[in-house]
Amino acid sequence: RPDYATVVYCTLIRHTYKKLPIIIGGIEASLRRMAHYDYWSNKVKRSILLDSGADIISYGMGERSIIEIADALDSGTDVKDITFIDGTVFKTMDREIIYDAIERPDYDVIKEDKREFARSFYIQYCNTDPFCAKRLVEPYDNSTLVVQNPPQKPLSQDEMDEVYALPYMRTYHPSYEEAGGVPAISEVKFSLISNRGCFGGCNFCALTFHQGR
């Protein structure tokens, strides 16, 4: 698995299938959906949406938003026009469609100023609650705007049951057998999911930022 795997894989896909819509999600894309500090390079990097060349990020857990994206594409909607789905991030140069958004500091500012970076992240952090979060916009120097829609609403009990009743393998990949397996599987193998997100705001944990409050 390469470093910056999402960027590497998206670049290869885009090189081969130039017009194919690319939707990214998961923990890497979700936590890097806007400008973010990167420990490997010790720099503030751009949204992964720009560096990967993908069209949309489905952030957080994403079960509902990915279905809505698929339905929109299936109906013939151009991927560039899918700007209305909660739990997604998209890019645009049209300010008219983001009139109601909270604007974060410009990327060129936050990458050079630690206080502005902290202020920018605070704005994003304060908008992780799906019931009161606002749409956010992050400007870049070429007039590109990265727009984060509010998080998707929590799943109902029936939806949650349906998700976790799917036929998962519930174990690690067989390739880990030679290394003796993954000991940590014993801690979670029989876990029961009762809720998502967290009411806390611990500095060392990204759970609230990823799954919501």
Task: Write out the residue ranges for each language-model feature.
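Glycine-rich beta-alpha loop elements in corrinoid/cobalamin-binding modules
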Residues: 1-141, 148
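Radical SAM [4Fe-4S] cluster-binding motif and immediate context
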Residues: 126-213
